[in-house]
Every structure is written in C-alpha cells, then in structure tokens.
C-alpha cells in the first residue's frame, strides 16, 4: 500500500487525518441549454450552430436482433436526417447538449456509450456545423479517458466546466466520485488543476488503517515523509492528486 500511495497519489493530511487528498426541457425548446441530457427517442429543439434557427434533434439506438439487452449502434438525427452513427455493441448511450463557450454561438454535444455497471467504452464531444457533425475531441484524450460514465456540472458558458466521474483512478479505497475541472480551448479539452475534490458521500466515508501508512509530501521517491497514519486511525479522503 505504501508503494501505491507514494507512486500514484499525493495525499494531503489534516489533524483529523482527513486527507486533503447531475432540468428537463419540454419537447420544443428553441433556447440554448447549458447542460441538458436528452432522453432516448425524444425530439428536442436547439439552435445548435447559432444561425437563429432551431434544429430538431433526436438520438436512437438499433437493438441487437439476437439479444434485446444490447444495441449495435447509436444514431443522431437532426431535422429527421441521420447525420451521425457510431457502431458499437453496448447497453446504454446518452447525449448531452452543452453550451461550454457561449462566445462562439454554438452548442456542444457530448456522447457517451457503455455497458453494464456504468462502464464506458466510448465518449466524444461534437458540433453541428449546419451540414454535418464534427467530432472535435474524444476519450483518446487523457483528460477524458475514464472507464465509467460521467456527468456535467458548473457549465457557465465561459469555456470551463466540471465532470463528476465514478472512480476515475483505481485506489485501495474502492469506488468514489471525483469532481474534475476542465476547460475547452481551440477545440481541445484539458484539465485545469491536478488536484480533484471528492464529492457527495465519497468525501464522508471513513477508512480505518490496517497498518501504519507513511504519507509523503509529494509523489516522488525523493520526497520526505509528511506524517504517518498509525494503525487503527480513521481516515477521510477529501482530495486526490493523480501523477
């Protein structure tokens, strides 16, 4: 355990041994939503490309004929025309409409596709240019490369936003939710800080140390020990810093 803590995370301590270590729109809505997850097979109306005209938007899945629990592809329709299809055999998919940067007069679309236990196999960010869908970023990007479904928060149209991710990094503590701040600039999404807050009940969990744990000032072999958590001490994880 000491090696894992030292090599992968830098966790900050406090006296209490607390480590400083997702509104539904109507069917017709011509106004831009900043953070709207769409329902499958339901029509919505958004001005996606800032031309003053609302596009009719809907996404569907094509059910696997051999197993109704799975689909073989996800398709996006704009003004009743199939403009995008992702072929992937999975169990769930969702589209979210976002206005990440209101200064560009366009809306962003986020697609996530995955399987059981909210495991995510593909995600991408897209825009409608009036003629076709353009995918400008996806989960090959390290800042978006997570294995489970995420939701959006703090979308204010200034280019910055947060995603809340289920267990973005493997830790001995098991599952947890972390808030990851991101920004969109020049069609690229990047993280804005290296330290991520745990959210909801995740930051309230208490863990009991099974043995002494050395906590280092930095995730480095040359780092000095900040303090030692003693066997039996109770710990809360509040922040994480992946390296």
Located regions from the model:
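Low-complexity, acidic Ser/Thr/Pro-rich repeat tracts that form intrinsically disordered stalk/linker regions
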Residues: 28-40
